[in-house]
């Protein structure tokens, strides 16, 4: 390890900002990189110094240790085996350093008991399109961890002694020095609880929490759509050691509808009409989520034509406006015709034969086909 002042190595003052440290490192590392200075031992050593300095100053925790104790902060405990938690002897000044940095984790005073917020939970809720559009209240059941009623979350039987774990001093975690770096793991003695219980509660086996089914009422606002999430604060799993519970996220899934397809705030549907109405025009009733409305079909309507019924879509969940209902006309071909009906259609067809103005798309299509093959033969 270099004994040079890390700030001097990077050409910085002690109060340099994180951005200044990062810029200095990038500039100097690029200048002294071995690939740019092949064969230069001096550049190689300089690059190592720069890298070492940045590994310390670029890490807020290591930088704080270095600012207070200099190189001494990293001179002890560097063996491959490290140390087994907080409490062992034989580390001299290194132990004192970490006691100050981490609140007495190596010997002296106890650290604050670990408090872990409960897990967030997810519940997938399926609702109908009508419920999504209008809003609805739903009752749901979830299986989750709740505070133990027997011990009130302490994890101990009544009158039982609860002590701070002597191995991790209540943190639930132990740190190990491995060479230049430090790792943190769950305390193997208390399994992360930070405490030692003389007589664990029989109901929760010392955890302070038990699994239970909860019944909840969820209010779904109008205008929600598939993928929307509702957060129920504090309805997730109970936290450890009396920590706050997590949240419950209700994820909305809207069922497919028999008539309507939703796209944002608009609703789409297909409306079948007879070919005579398409030719002559007329009026039909179309469904909406609020009932039926009348829709005028102009004469000479072609299949696939879209008609917009304004304001009959979905009101935005954020309020303010409603989408539209878009009706796509589908012209039905008559089926199960008797001979008399077929003869009438043949006469109609004969009366239209050769008159392109009655069938503009038909004539336009075959004219386009003829032009296509004429061009191929040239």
From Swiss-Prot:
Coiled coil: none
SUPFAM superfamilies: Chaperone J-domain, DnaJ/Hsp40 cysteine-rich domain, HSP40/DnaJ peptide-binding domain
Binding site for Zn(2+) 1: 148, 151, 201, 204
Function field: Participates actively in the response to hyperosmotic and heat shock by preventing the aggregation of stress-denatured proteins and by disaggregating proteins, also in an autonomous, DnaK-independent fashion. Unfolded proteins bind initially to DnaJ; upon interaction with the DnaJ-bound protein, DnaK hydrolyzes its bound ATP, resulting in the formation of a stable complex. GrpE releases ADP from DnaK; ATP binding to DnaK triggers the release of the substrate protein, thus completing the reaction cycle.
Domain of life the protein comes from: Bacteria
Swiss-Prot/TrEMBL GO biological process terms: chaperone cofactor-dependent protein refolding; DNA replication; protein refolding; response to heat
Chain positions of CXXCXGXG motif repeats: 148-155, 165-172, 187-194, 201-208
Record remark on domains: The J domain is necessary and sufficient to stimulate DnaK ATPase activity. Zinc center 1 plays an important role in the autonomous, DnaK-independent chaperone activity of DnaJ. Zinc center 2 is essential for interaction with DnaK and for DnaJ activity.
Ranges where the J domain occurs: 5-70
Claim: Translocase is one of the keywords in the record: no
Residues annotated to bind Zn(2+) 2: 165, 168, 187, 190
Cofactor: Zn(2+)
Gene source species: Glaesserella parasuis serovar 5 (strain SH0165) (Haemophilus parasuis)
Keywords: Chaperone, Cytoplasm, DNA replication, Metal-binding, Repeat, Stress response, Zinc, Zinc-finger
GO molecular function: ATP binding; heat shock protein binding; unfolded protein binding; zinc ion binding
Protein name, UniProt field: Chaperone protein DnaJ
Chief place of localization: cytoplasm
Entries under PROSITE patterns matching the protein: DNAJ_1 (PS00636), DNAJ_2 (PS50076), ZF_CR (PS51188)
Zinc finger (CR-type) residue numbers: 135-213
